[in-house]
Swiss-Prot record:
Function: Involved in pre-mRNA splicing. May function at or prior to the first catalytic step of splicing at the catalytic center of the spliceosome. May do so by stabilizing the catalytic center or the position of the RNA substrate.
One GO BP: RNA splicing
Compartments (UniProt record): Cytoplasm; Nucleus
Residue ranges of the region described as Disordered: 143-205
Keyword field: Coiled coil, Cytoplasm, mRNA processing, mRNA splicing, Nucleus, Spliceosome
Protein name according to UniProt: Pre-mRNA-splicing factor CWC21
Pfam family, one: cwf21
PANTHER family named in the record: SERINE/ARGININE REPETITIVE MATRIX 2 (PTHR36562), SERINE_ARGININE REPETITIVE MATRIX 2 (PTHR36562:SF5)
Coiled coil segments of this chain: 63-103, 148-190
């Protein structure tokens, strides 16, 4: 008990006996930490959460360093093995040099893959690239585009493009119909002339 507030004893109360402030009545803070509210309320909140996730590209320098480190680990393992067999230092250096050149030219023989964040990011990047090609996803595809709220300008531009495509389709159909009609008339004219010539030839005979 403190200041005549609280329990005389904590026994049987299921609490520690200390007085704590009730925060149930406090208003939930809006916006990010710091008390700054979102720009225009709910719309700005939706805009912020609808942005596509940011994928950090792996650092090629770190990946190269990790590859070289793994090569040297293999070389040191070979060196220890040859030293235990009692080989000459020159022969050991030659074998280590051959193995180093082989692993540098064919890094896939290192086996396994790194467990650091950059190695995992590189493997994930390759996996996503394969999946993208398999599903036929465009390179310019924007993640989260389906959940992005369309502005009035974007909607007007989209409708204008749709009307333009529809107009071009109708014009192309009319042009094809006119060409077909023209070819039909030309064929009928040729057929009429052919029949006339044939009729004249029969009259002469």
């Amino acid at each position: 008990m403190y200041g005549n507030v609280g329990l005389a004893t904590a026994r049987g109360s299921g609490t520690n006996g200390y007085v704590t402030r009730n925060t149930a009545h406090l208003r939930i803070r809006e916006g990010p930490p710091g008390g700054q509210p979102y720009g225009s309320g709910y719309d700005a909140l939706l805009e912020s959460v609808s942005k596509p996730p940011i994928h950090r590209a792996p650092d090629q320098g770190i990946l190269e360093h990790e590859r070289k480190r793994r090569v040297e680990v293999k070389v040191m393992e070979l060196r220890d093995e040859l030293e235990e067999k009692g080989m000459e230092e020159d022969d050991i250096e030659e074998e280590c040099s051959k193995l180093r050149q082989k692993l540098t030219a064919q890094p896939e023989q290192l086996g396994g893959r790194g467990l650091d964040t950059h190695s995992l990011a590189a493997a994930k990047e390759i996996e996503m690239s394969r999946l993208q090609r398999a599903l036929g996803v465009s390179v310019n595809h924007e993640e989260g585009r389906a959940f992005k709220r369309e502005t009035e300008e974007e909607k007007a531009a989209r409708l204008a493009k749709r009307e333009e495509r529809e107009r071009e389709r109708i014009e192309a159909a009319i042009t094809r119909e006119r060409e077909n009609e023209k070819r039909k008339q030309e064929w009928e004219e040729k057929e009429r002339l052919r029949r006339r010539e044939e009729y004249k030839r029969r009259r002469r005979d």
